[in-house]
Amino acid sequence: MDQTYLDQQQLDANVNHQQLSQDTNSIPQQQLQQQQQPLQQLQQYQQQPLSNANFSGDNRFQQYQPRVTPSVSSSQQSIHNTTGYVTMHSGNYTPNQQYGVPNQYTVLQQQPPRQQSYEENINPLSYNSNYRTLSAPIPPLHIQHQLASKQNQDQNQSQNRYEQSSMTSIHTNDNSSSVNNSPNTMMIKQEHSTFQPQHSNEGSSAYHPVDQQNHQQQQQPQQQQQPQQQQQPQQQQQPQQPMTRSICTRCKKGFDQPIIYPKSSNSTNGNNSNGQNSSSIPPPEPRTFKLCDHCRKLQRQRSRRWQKKTKDREGVCRRCGSEIPLAERRFVLCPSCRENLRLRKASRAAQGRCVHCSGPLDASILSKENEGNNNGDEQNNKSNEDQNNESRRGSQEKPARGASHKVCQRCRENDKIRRANLEKMGNCNRCAKALDPNEYGRNKVCFNCRTKKKRSPPENVTNTDEVRTSPIQNQYGMNMSHQYIQPPPPPPPPLMTGHHQFQPQPHMMGHEQMNTFTTMSNSGVAGIQQPNNGMVVGDQQQQQQQHNGSMQLQPTYYQSYVQMPPPLQLQQQQQQQQQHYSLDGIPQQPHSAPTSSFPPPPPPPLQLNQHQGLQQYSHAQQQQQQQHQQQQPYHQEYPNN
């Protein structure tokens, strides 16, 4: 292949050729000889006859020989040596290189930068990466059977290839043996046997090529027959799975799928846990698919993309993508999807299938060592028996939990694997979000999931809905539980001496009463203070009557509120007033409210007539004089009050 070079005229047309020739003549002769040595070697190399010995590759690589003419190269060298031109660097060319063979550098150079960076960096989410030593999940039962069948097919193909190669070697050996049995070879053997005693001093070290060939030919068929005899019972032990032809509901193409009968513990054991024979229980139905392998793979990828898309959005259902109401944002699914999921899980549990994958609960996991062999089946049977015994023991120890699980063994193992992988990756076990760096090694669950777990009520608490939606609230906005609390000891009575006015305690008054009492006490008129004080006492008595009537109608409503009991003398006076001024005319029992740590709610406003208020006012004046006479010995005992 001729290489084209740039001529002097192509570089610059205004160059004086005479000046170039003078420059070349001025170069010393020794330098020219050194430059012309590699050119002479190339000419000698071209003059030699072409042969396969000169090339390491095949004949097809001989056409890429470099052909360099001395005239052009000399002119180019003169241009390089001149001062007015820039040297042109030739490519890194090696003469006997095989063209078309990809090099590591060329492959990396042809790749886009994104792919180069992806191959250089390790993908942390790949299950097969050795960097994080993550374990892959257990595939479903049908995929396990498919993998086992593929392995069996590969083994059978390799065995067939080995048999074919062995048969061809046997035929070649037969041909060689027929040649050895010819009369010429027999004469050679006889001559060799007669010639052997002459070398008796060498002993057994003598080399006999014909005898050695016969000995090898006899040993080879014996060695080939032994593995064939061992392979035949193995092929008989591996039964072929029945296949069915079905049509994919998505692409409308036909595909073959094996009929898989799940291995249940009832079929392996002669008797069930209930003592019934396995013949009475029908065998499990085979599992078939409506989609082909290609469409199922696409569906899994599509659902995975949808989950990633909805996971980033907050307040959106993971399944249908609709917005979740604000009151139910603690859930991941919307109400309709949660209801459908509950119904689906209930139907699966009723049919005795796994709630998560809808597979058989008693399906065994195939062992990796002995897949498709009878030994593996026996181990699976033993493992099923052990599982049944453990489940029976667990049911005897914990009868409330139930003997069987709602989730199959494969899903439980996969959940453990998923949690272990998330823990290795530094993510939360529940929501799979990245943990804070400060929580590495201390917590396996993120802060949000921990707070959600603390907020959720325990399972042992009964009547949780009543506690949540209870209408009983105090004035501070807190829910009250129906509990009785022992009251503290009663404080000293709030009665004053003769020169002090009577001040009722806050627990005996409502909000409106306190306002009226403060306004009347700040008025500054001493003559009006006593009637107003009596007015307050009369209003308080009537409010207490209504409060007692409401307690009879709703005894449970006021069980959580506190009201301190008044002194004995005031209780007697209140009983007399209640009997005399009861609205219904029926004597009521004295108020003995249950105790609690919070003050009572304000009673409803009163609606009093003018005549009724005048009667209470006149009666309060009469009672005030009696109270002063009765309180004199009491104040002698409590002089500070």
Curated annotation (Swiss-Prot):
Its main location: nucleus. InterPro entries: Mediator_comp_sub12. It comes from the Eukaryota. Transmembrane segments: none annotated. Keywords: Metal-binding, Nucleus, Transcription, Transcription regulation, Zinc, Zinc-finger. Residues 379-400 have a biased composition (Basic and acidic residues). GO terms for biological process: biological process involved in symbiotic interaction; establishment or maintenance of cell type involved in phenotypic switching; mating; phenotypic switching; positive regulation of phenotypic switching. This is White-opaque regulator 3. The gene is WOR3.
